[in-house]
Amino acid sequence: MYHPGRSPSFLITLANVICAAILFDIHTGGYQPGSLIPIVAWMTPFVTLLWLSASFATYLYKYVRTRLLPEEKVARVYYTAQSAPYFDPALGVMMQFAPSHGGASIEVQVNPSWISLLGGSLKINGDDASNESAVLGSFYSSVKPGDEPASLVAIKSGPQTIGFGCRTKIDGDDCLFTANHVWNNSMRPTALAKRGKQVAIEDWETPLSCDHKMLDFVVVRVPKHVWSKLGVKATQLVCPSDKDAVTCYGGSSSDNLLSGTGVCSKVDFSWKLTHSCPTAAGWSGTPIYSSRGVVGMHVGFEDIGKLNRGVNAFYVSNYLLRSQETLPPELSVIEIPFEDVETRSYEFIEVEIKGRGKAKLGKREFAWIPESGKYWADDDDDSLPPPPKVVDGKMVWSSAQETVAEPLNLPAGGRVKALAALSQLAGYDFKEGEAASTRGMPLRFVGQSACKFRELCRKDTPDEVLRATRVFPELSDFSWPERGSKAELHSLLLQAGKFNPTGIPRNLEGACQNLLERYPASKSCYCLRGEAWSFDAVYEEVCKKAQSAEINEKASPGVPLSRLASTNKDLLKRHLELVALCVTERLFLLSEAEDLLDESPVDLVRRGLCDPVRLFVKQEPHASRKVREGRFRLISSVSLVDQLVERMLFGPQNQLEIAEWEHIPSKPGMGLSLRQQAKSLFDDLRVKHSRCPAAEADISGFDWSVQDWELWADVEMRIVLGGFGHKLAKAAQNRFSCFMNSVFQLSDGTLIEQQLPGIMKSGSYCTSSTNSRIRCLMAELIGSPWCIAMGDDSVEGWVDGAKDKYMRLGHTCKDYKPCATTISGRLYEVEFCSHVIREDRCWLASWPKTLFKYLSEGKWFFEDLERDVSSSPHWPRIRHYVVGNTPSPHKTNLQNQSPRYGEEVDKTTVNQGYSEHSGSPGHSIEEAQEPEAAPFCCEAASVYPGWGVHGPYCSGDYGSLT
């Protein structure tokens, strides 16, 4: 505790007070002179003064020496966010921050749970011009130097990697293929790099490029010594298939690479594809690799955080940059005249390709834009080649091809030069033989042909299928059919015996008029317009079509050209001029022939108006009951010459219907492998179903029950829709007359004549289009308010008594049932074209046949099976079995793949014990739990309880058939 008596100041003050008291006493005389006390009393103040002086001096000294400094404070340093969160493939969620006191910004890794804040900033680079996007749920892997594809190369601008590309061949040139926005932008490329080494870019030529955002590519001619120095090898560009497993590569340098895997998907537009591989800054132009090669090139994002976009490299290389006229068939892309673009209901994109010109790109079509801005087919007749002239009974072309420079003799009912050679090649020996059959469609043997085909034996069911039957009992219902002329004849007699000729319905004209309103008008082939055709112009167009991607190169050319080559490819390679001349001459004959209705099928062949139709058994698994019965599926192979005749007459019309499938009743252009196409179809059916409940009809042996009046109705509608002139209309009518009056040929050369008009020939170019329109016409005739058809498959508005009405039209309807709905009457599921279609998914219903064929092939291509069956609810167990029991080199990393579109097991189906093998259609859970309802007045009402007791359209009276 503090005590004041212990303080020096207190003691000094006390001593001075005492001394002051003593001095006061001295002053008042209290002490005697000579006493020492006054001296001591004076000394104390003096010492005190000295002490004070010394203390003050000390204070001054310390004061002067003490430095006054600014107050020290704790400095608060903080950083301000300069960007929204973005995604880095190696580090995760990142942000840019700048310090409050100034200075360079820093990159900070933030909490991964903040992924929800990414939003639109999934674009990797963070700036608005970025083309790159991460894909949520995807992963990246580090790639060791040297493990990347040998064709991959990095494109540098100084130390920064601005893109990637690959070495490949474009139209025969060895080149670099990359994105145009990588090669031609503000950051000029300075070097190509591979495995940590780089070579400076010089003034290399870029002969082909396109700067359109949707078709972003450039072709760079890189010297071979550069490729050699870098150790870069060429890769091939391959046609993408839907759901290809693909990989993309990228990174900050060529020896610090990451890879991202995903699935490649085709879209409606063939020049474009989408993929789910994640990308990062500087990945533009990177090749999209599948196990087969490069399927595309990454150019940007399609849907931020979900899907990226690529250019279909195979399409660009083989359709837009190819200098040869012949186009590959893989993508089923066709070139159309520029004037036909305006007949399509969807938008084409217009692109300019440096080194090729301007083009319009559609879904599965493209057209080159004429440089003059005017299509040459729009020229006046005076500017077209002169028409042929008749001189002394001979038709002469003033500018004929060298191979037909001589005047061609065209006497009435005769043949021209090339067709005469064709007939001589066939070696027909026509003779009137005995009747082959008098039941249904009467048939008669009429001779032999010198054009014969190999007689093959039936294929045995392999052990692989027998073993799989223990796991998939559905496979036991299939086997391979018999082959050869004996099987062909037996099946022909069975099929034709079911033909039931009928009269023309009284309401046919009105039904045709109603149907015409649902189809678009088309334009005919430009060289067949007007009444004066140019032989040279027709011949030139035939040559183009013969070399187009539309022709199946692997198919047989039919009778009699199979004597020259076994495939269309080999035939056209060696004898293009002969084929084109035969087609051209036949077109002119068809446009002039009269009174063909009085001619027999043999007479039509003799006159050179058509060729025999070859019959053969289709090599696909057949139901065992059909094999036991000997009722095999026959293909009616129409000759290549007749196919090209049909393409010339009806090609533009059929192509328009394919392009417009979403807007017309006929669906030959439909492709259910794409999710958006299946959804578009189901949405359309749901709307139609709300008008009149949907029903599925199964017509037995449709091709063999087609009536002549149905074929005549189709060709007359074609003439109206195409605006055919008189000459073209006559050619079309005569072609159909030949079409419905055929001579069939078996593999051993036996010729058989049909003696009544009718029957659809399955190998015709018009089969899908004509069958679809006839099928819609049938629905119109029985009173269905709507119908869609793909060949003989249909979904239509319900009609009571439909089976009997179809029978009166000559068609046996073995099954007619309403489509599955929910308890509220909403459309739930349809089966169409062997596919089960629902609102959010679609899968192949005939998977047992596909699996049987796959296991029987002996060549294990897992990707083919996956492409066809992966959307089925049975795919997980199929994949599990195939991966473990077949020796395919293509099955890698399959067990851990994430489910594909439609792959997840359908819980609705499983919960109800639905088996496709049993043939019972699946219904919704709501239907399964539906309580027993009151009696209904008709079958339709019992299936659509939401419509009430009476159901929709109960009367069923939709037009007279007699």
Curated annotation (Swiss-Prot):
Cellular compartments per GO CC: host cell membrane; membrane
Site (Cleavage): E132, S133, E325, T326, E402, T403
Domain named RdRp catalytic: residues: 692-806
EC identifiers of the protein: 3.4.21.-, 2.7.7.48
Catalytic activity: RNA(n) + a ribonucleoside 5'-triphosphate = RNA(n+1) + diphosphate
UniProt xrefs under Pfam families: Peptidase_S39 (PF02122), RdRP_4 (PF02123)
UniProt PTM: The polyprotein is proteolytically cleaved into several chains by the viral protease.
GO term, biological process aspect, one: proteolysis
Record's keyword terms, sorted: Covalent protein-RNA linkage, Host membrane, Hydrolase, Membrane, Nucleotide-binding, Nucleotidyltransferase, Protease, RNA-directed RNA polymerase, Serine protease, Transferase, Transmembrane, Transmembrane helix, Viral RNA replication
Gene Ontology molecular function terms on file: nucleotide binding; RNA binding; RNA-directed RNA polymerase activity; serine-type endopeptidase activity
Residue ranges annotated for the Peptidase S39 domain, each copy included: 135-335
InterPro entries in UniProt: DNA/RNA_pol_sf, Peptidase_S1_PA, Peptidase_S1_PA_chymotrypsin, Peptidase_S39B_luteovirus, RNA-dir_pol_luteovirus
Protein name: Replicase polyprotein P2AB
Native source species: Southern bean mosaic virus (isolate Bean/United States/Arkansas)
Lineage: Viruses, Riboviria, Orthornavirae, Pisuviricota, Pisoniviricetes
